[in-house]
Swiss-Prot record:
The lineage of its organism: Bacteria, Pseudomonadati, Chlorobiota, Chlorobiia, Chlorobiales. The chain crosses the membrane at residues 276-296, 538-558, 596-616, 620-640. It holds the Pfam family FtsX. SMART domains: AAA. InterPro entries: AAA+_ATPase, ABC3_permease_C, ABC_transporter-like_ATP-bd, ABC_transporter-like_CS, MacB-like_ATP-bd, MacB_PCD, Macrolide_Exporter_MacB, P-loop_NTPase. Belongs to the ABC transporter superfamily. Macrolide exporter (TC 3.A.1.122) family. Keywords: Antibiotic resistance, ATP-binding, Cell inner membrane, Cell membrane, Membrane, Nucleotide-binding, Translocase, Transmembrane, Transmembrane helix, Transport. GO terms for biological process: response to antibiotic. This is Macrolide export ATP-binding/permease protein MacB. The keyword Zinc-finger does not apply.
Amino acid sequence: MNPLLELLDVHRTYQIGETTVNALRGVSLTIDRGEFVAIMGASGSGKSSLLQILGLLDNPDKGEFKILGNNVNTLSEDEQAGVRNNVAGFVFQQFHLLKRMTIVDNVRLPHIYSGLKGDFRQEAIARLKLVGLEERIDHTPNQLSGGEQQRVAIARALVRDPLIIFADEPTGNLDSKNSAEIMKIFTALHEEGKTIIMVTHENDIAAYACRVIIMKDGLIVSDERKAEMQPSRAVTGESAFDISGSGKGSIWQDGRFTGFMAQAFQSILANKMRTFLSVLGIFVGVASVIAMMALGEGAKSAMQEQLKSMGSNMLSIRGGSAKIRGAAQGAGAVARFSFNDVNDIASLGKLVKNASGVVNGSARIVYGNKNWSSTLTGVGFDYGTMRASIPAIGRWFTREEIQIREKSAIIGVTVVKEIFGSSNPIGKTIKINRINFKVIGIAPAKGFSGPQDEDDVVIIPVTTAMYRVLGKDYLSSIFVEVASPGLMGQAKTAITELIRKKHRLEEGDDSFNIRDMTEIQKMLSSTTQTMSLLLGSIAAISLLVGGIGIMNIMLVSVTERTREIGLRKAIGARKNDIMLQFLIESVGMTISGGLIGVFAGVGISLILAFFAGWAVKTSLLSVVLATTFSALIGVFFGLWPARKAAALKPVEALRYE
C-alpha cells in the first residue's frame, strides 16, 4: 500500500532581498493514512515551509512529492487547486474567515469551487453542529469569540470530507481553555480516521499527536512515534481521488457561476461607500452619453425637418447685379425672371421635374385689433410639393386660384399664434397690406433656419403677390426640382445656358446665380453629424474616466483582500475562478452605474428640452450602446486587477501583511 504522503529529498529555497534562505534541505518523509502528526521547531526551522508543501500551497525547488503514489510535482497550478479542494482541509492560526459572510456561508465556501451542483447549506450546518456551533449559523465572524472562529474554520476544513486536515498553529491565537477545546475536536477527528498534520511550537499541544517531528535549520532532526498512540485503525484499504483536479466542467453547468455572482455582489455591498463612488463615475459617464446623444439626435431631427422643408434635388435661381470679368455693372444690368423663364426651365425634358416662380416681400397683417409684420411669399402651384409646404390643416391653392389672382392665404404657425392665438383661423378674413385675404390653410411647422423663423410667413398665389400686393412685374427667384440627384450637374449647366441665351448675357456675365440645395443639405447634415460625434466623444471621455476609477478601486480591493484570495486558492479556487469573480465585481459595478445612468440621462435630456426649448430624442441605440460600453469598460478596466489577483500564489497571499 502506498503511503498517503511521501517526500523524497525535498529542497525549498527563498530569496529575501539579496539573502538566500534554505527553508528545506533534503527532507525525506512518509506519512500514512490515519496519523496525527505534529511538526515542531523554532522559528525559521522550516516547519511551516514543510506544511505548505505537504498541503500543495507551495512547490519544492527540488525532490519528489507524492500523494498515494502519484507525483504531484508535475501538476499544473489549477490541477493542484483541484487536489486541495478534494483532499485537503486547512485550519490557520489567523482563522481566515470572510467577515462579510455568515459562518454557514464561510463553511460551505469550498463547495463553490468543487464543481458540484447544490446548495450545501445543510451539509455546512451539520459540520457546524459537529463543532458545537449549530445555534450560531447566521452570525458573522466578528460576533464570535476567537475559539468559536477557529471552530468555524475547522467546520470549513471538514465540509468537503477531506483525507487530510492541515493545521498551521491552530491554537496560536487562543487561550488555554479554547486551545484545549480545539485539540479535543482534532482528537475526535483523528479517532474517526482523519489524517491530521499540525504545526505547533507548544509541547502541550504536540502531546495530542501520535507522532512528533522536530525540525531545525531545514532538516528533520527527530521523528518519534508514541507507542501508546498508534495511527487510527478506522482507516483501511486504498483510497483514490481525482488527481487532475475538480471543477473542470463548464461554469454554467456546474453552478460555479451562480456562486461567483453571489460572492461578487456580497463583496460589492460590503463596501457601500466605495461602491457608490465607483458607480458614480460610470453613472455620470453613461448619463452624459445618453443626454448628449439625445441632444445630438434632437438637433439631427430638427435639421432633417428643415432639410425636408427645402425639398430634395432642389436648385434655387436668383437674379443679382451683373459682374463682367469681375467688374460690377449698374442696377439696370440685372437678370429679371418672368413666368416665361419658369415655363422654359420646366420644359427641359428629362432634367427638370417641376419649376415654380417665387416673389418675396413684406406683409403687414391685421385681424380685428391684432396686427403683425411678417414675410410675404408668392408661389406657384408646384411650390407646395417641391418645398414640403402643403398644409396639414386646410388646403393648398388650386391652379385656377393662381390664374385668377385669388386673394387666398396660407399662414405660418407663428402668424397663427400672434394673430389668432388658440382659435382656428381657417375661413377667417385678414388684411394683408390693407387688402382682404381669406385664410385657407396653415403651413407646416418648419422652425428656425439660423436666425430666421421659417414659420413667420404668409404664402399667397404668386400672381396675386405680384399684381395685387407688391406691384412687381418680375420674379424674385425660381425654384427648380431636378429629376434625380445624378442629374444635378447637367441641370445646372442646361439652365445656365438657357438663361444666358434667352437674356442675351455674355459668357462671363454672372448677373444670376444658381444655388444647389443638395449641397446645402449635405453640409448641414455633415455639421450635425460632427456635432453629435463631438458631444458623444466628450461624454465617452467621462465614461473612460469612470472606468479608470473602477480599475483603481479594484486594484485597491485586490491588495486589501490578498489574504482572502490566498484562502480561496487554498480551498480549491483556480486562477480563472479568482479572475472571474473580480471581473464579475467590476462588471457588476459598471452595469449598475450604466443602468442608473440611462434613466438619469433620459431625465436630464427631458429637463434640458423643457428649459431650453430644444427637442431631444433618446434612441434605443444610444441606450444599448451606453449600457454595452459600460459593461465592456468593466471588463477592460477590471481585467488587470483580476489578472493580478489570479496570479497571486496561495502561500504568499496567506502570509501577506
